[in-house]
Structures are given as structure tokens and as C-alpha cells.
């Protein structure tokens, strides 16, 4: 529940979904709580291309920051954009979250070696 969390100046979303899911329904639930959208293409035949996902968001009055080829790329861009107290949320599919977790793990490995 994003609304119940402590204050953050901005909420950045790393977002990717599969074509057989209710994209509009998911977006409707969170659109007032996200300030910037970083949209990612998901792999496989069920993955929605980032451009198509951005059009669905635009139909709901949401401006997408940029489209990316993968959740990891979207996350890295969100990290560059985010301020010190901002939060980044990854959602839409387990594939989105897995891609972001992989990028976080890669960051940690680079910083510890």
C-alpha cells in the first residue's frame, strides 16, 4: 500500500506487464501515487512492448518518462533520476520484479568487488 508508507518526495515506477493481464485496472489503482513512470518491455511472447504499454498509460492521462528494453534498464534509469529520499517501486509482473532484483544484485556485486 503506497499510500500508507512514510512520505517520499517522489515515487518512481518501473513497470512492465504481460499482455494477458489487466493493464488498465492495475494502472488505475496506482496512477495517483506514481510521479514518474519508467516502462519496460517484458521478454517472451506474452510480454507487452514498452511502447504499447506507454500508449495504454497515455490513454489514462499518464505521461511516461521513457521506454526501455528491459526492467533492468528501466530500473537503472530510475536510479539515476531518483533523489535521495525518493522511492522506486517495481510492479506489474514477477518478470518486472525479477529483472529489477537482478539489476540490484549486479549493483551490489560491483560495489563489493
What do these predicted ranges mean?
Residues 24-87:
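C-terminal helical cap/extension that packs against the catalytic core
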Residues 111-113:
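S-adenosylmethionine-dependent methyltransferases
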Residues 93:
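Active-site-proximal loop/hinge segments that shape catalytic or ion-binding/gating pockets
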Residues 96-98:
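Short, active-site-adjacent cap segments at secondary-structure transitions
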Residues 10-12, 87-90:
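Residue-level preference for the first positions of well-ordered beta-strands
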Residues 2, 6, 57, 82, ...:
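Active-site catalytic pocket residues across diverse enzymes, especially alpha/beta-hydrolases
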Residues 1-36:
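Nucleotide phosphate-binding/pyrophosphate-handling subdomain across enzymes
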Amino acid at each position: 500500500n503506497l499510500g500508507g508508507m512514510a512520505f517520499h518526495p517522489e515515487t518512481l515506477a518501473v513497470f512492465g506487464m504481460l499482455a494477458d493481464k489487466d493493464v488498465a485496472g492495475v494502472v488505475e489503482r496506482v496512477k495517483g501515487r506514481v510521479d514518474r513512470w519508467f516502462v519496460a518491455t517484458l521478454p517472451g511472447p506474452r510480454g507487452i512492448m514498452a511502447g504499447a504499454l506507454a500508449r495504454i498509460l497515455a490513454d489514462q492521462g499518464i505521461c511516461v518518462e521513457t521506454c526501455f528494453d528491459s526492467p533492468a534498464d528501466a530500473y537503472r534509469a530510475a536510479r539515476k533520476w531518483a533523489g535521495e529520499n525518493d522511492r522506486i517501486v517495481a510492479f506489474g509482473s514477477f518478470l518486472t520484479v525479477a529483472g529489477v532484483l537482478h539489476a540490484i544484485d549486479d549493483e551490489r556485486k560491483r560495489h563489493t568487488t
